[in-house]
């Protein structure tokens, strides 16, 4: 079996909740990922499900691990927006794994700043959505708006719960001004 251990899927533009574009959080437009004033080209059609499946078939890839979009780690977002965005992203990834279990293993993300919400979301994703992989950024913005390593002691409860639930943990490089 051939497994691609690091893949990303973009939701189609009509799948992204309106509030995310209205608030400048994330949307797709003119073949670009958009976030506030930031733009990044969608460099390959295989970022979308239909083309991803074609790409996997043409490259003889049996299964792919779908990681979360780093644009949606929710650094600097208020608690309500963080909750809504993370829940959207995790539900989207769960739907992919549910609809194509033979093709995808989906990860989910939490924001360590809001530790109680993060722990609840881990339980929801692992138990209710049956997602086996917790995706974490290398660092995140803390309550003082300072970049903090994911290895900080404040994050220990996340790792303890992941261990209790027998989750795989993937730490994804994340670009930030400083760490």
Language model region names:
Residues 1-179:
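Helix-coil boundary/capping segments in enzymes
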């Amino acid at each position: 079996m051939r497994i691609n251990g690091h893949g990303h899927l973009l939701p189609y533009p009509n799948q992204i909740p309106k509030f995310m574009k209205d608030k400048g959080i994330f949307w797709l437009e003119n073949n670009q990922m958009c976030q506030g004033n930031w733009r990044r080209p969608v460099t390959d059609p295989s970022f979308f499900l239909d083309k991803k499946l074609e790409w996997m078939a043409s490259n003889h890839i049996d299964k792919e691990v779908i990681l979360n979009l780093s644009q949606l780690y929710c650094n600097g977002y208020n608690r309500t927006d963080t909750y809504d965005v993370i829940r959207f992203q995790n539900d989207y990834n769960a739907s992919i794994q549910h609809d194509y279990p033979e093709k995808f293993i989906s990860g989910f993300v939490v924001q360590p700043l809001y530790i109680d919400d993060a722990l609840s979301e881990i339980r929801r994703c692992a138990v209710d959505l049956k997602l086996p992989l917790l995706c974490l950024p290398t660092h995140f913005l803390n309550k003082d708006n300072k970049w903090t390593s994911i290895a900080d002691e404040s994050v220990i409860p996340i790792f303890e719960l992941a261990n209790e639930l027998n989750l795989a943990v993937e730490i994804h490089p994340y670009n930030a001004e400083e760490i």
